Amino acid sequence: AIAVPFIVNPVEYSYTSNNLSEAINYPLDLEPLYNPVDSGKCEIPKVDLRRGKHVLAILSLSCSHCRVAAKKFRLIKQNNPGIPIYFILNGDTASYRPFITDTKANNIPSSQCAGRTFIKLASMQLPRIYYLDNSIVVKKVDYFELSQYNIEDWLNTGKAK
């Protein structure tokens, strides 16, 4: 009887941070965003993500899990506009408007990026969500774990949970 909830609603291990590489406290090379090799395919970020604390979400406009993450981020940003969230988006220009219409995440600054620069940042897992402190990856989370409280706690104490 105790196992019934897990049988009826199994944990999706393919989308939990348990499957993210546990490596943290390493510098994320953001330089390609500011000096992209494929400059025609990458919009330079509107803020300097290399300095200060940021929650960086790397999303695809066509990925359903990325849309869930964007919707959660919209609510987090709506509840606390001071949280420094930034999106790096991948997809064709025609997909941007439907993404924003669906997620209503137009309250979050973003840049579009494609090609090698995007692949280098995202790898093969989307959405990719990092807590960054001066370009150092302090924590990686998946969209299931997005928590306004945890982000605010990290911003205030410097300790990521």
State the predicted function of each range:
Residues 78-112:
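Conserved segment of the thioredoxin-like fold in thiol-based oxidoreductases
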Residues 120, 124-126, 130-161:
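Non-catalytic, surface beta->alpha helical segment in thiol-disulfide oxidoreductase systems
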Residues 65-81, 91, 144-145:
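Typically the conserved alpha-helix immediately C-terminal to a functionally engaged Cys/Sec
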Residues 37-42, 107-115, 142:
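Short acidic-hydrophobic, aromatic-tinged amphipathic segments that line or gate anion-handling sites
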